[in-house]
Amino acid sequence: MSQSFTPRPLVIAPSILAADFARLGEEVRAVDTAGADWMHLDVMDGHFVPNISYGPDVIKAMRPHTTKIFDAHLMIAPCDPYLEAFAKAGCDHITVHAEAGPHLHRTLQAIRNLGKKAGVSLNPGTPISAIEYVIDLVDLVLVMSVNPGFGGQAFIPSALGKISDLRAMTAGRPIDIEVDGGVSAAVAGQLAAAGANAFVAGSAVFKGGTVESYKANIDGIRAAAANARGEMV
């Protein structure tokens, strides 16, 4: 391995957006059993992104079905008025977009004051310099490798360079680098080699519709990433 840092643990975070919403609790339990590390919760408002998903009440309803980390990705603007509601709903990580408001530093402070881990998400066209001066408040950086709003899009290859630059920027800090968009076993190795350690996958995890298929899908992504890091699984 060429990196000089101690790698962050590998994390597979199924995107609940790709689950069967008619069986949401059952689906959460299924991916938990299948080996998910985090549950990635895509919150969309139809304003910041061109789609609407779910809010704190639905997340609260999911919370009793798993003890795994709830990794909330707020694709909403403004986000500050809603941070407390998502914290109370049971989210462990709250990630906001660098592009969603003018006061990112204040927003990250607010998340941490709620006792939650604070994340920043970067759209494909947003440079990593957007977080340079708030890095001390960041626990997680979420790199969008598709344009946010819809699942099932194709992976944008330029995300690899951004991830590599982010890993250099965050070297020596306990910051997770998470990637979301078009993630599958086919690209997980490249992403891990670039420096990502947390992988959001929606359709690539939920295809098959059974615990067994979800486990095979999660295991495939994990194995590809681990292999690229020279690790055994």
Question: Residue locations for each model-derived region?
Answer:
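N-terminal amphipathic alpha-helix/helix-capping segment at the start of soluble metabolic enzymes
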Residues: 1-18, 25-26, 226-233
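Hydrophobic faces of well-ordered beta-strands that scaffold small-molecule active sites
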Residues: 10-16, 39-41, 62, 70-74, ...
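Conserved, mostly hydrophobic/aromatic
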Residues: 24, 31, 42, 86, ...
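Catalytic cores of alpha/beta
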Residues: 28, 80-88, 126-137, 182-199
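N-terminal active-site wall of soluble small-molecule enzyme domains
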Residues: 41-110
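Glycine-rich phosphate-binding active-site loops on the catalytic face of alpha/beta enzymes
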Residues: 94-102, 142-154, 194-217
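C-terminal helical cap(s) of enzyme catalytic domains, especially alpha/beta-barrels
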Residues: 111, 192, 207-233
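Histidine/lysine/aspartate-rich catalytic loop segments that bind and position anionic ligands
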Residues: 121-157
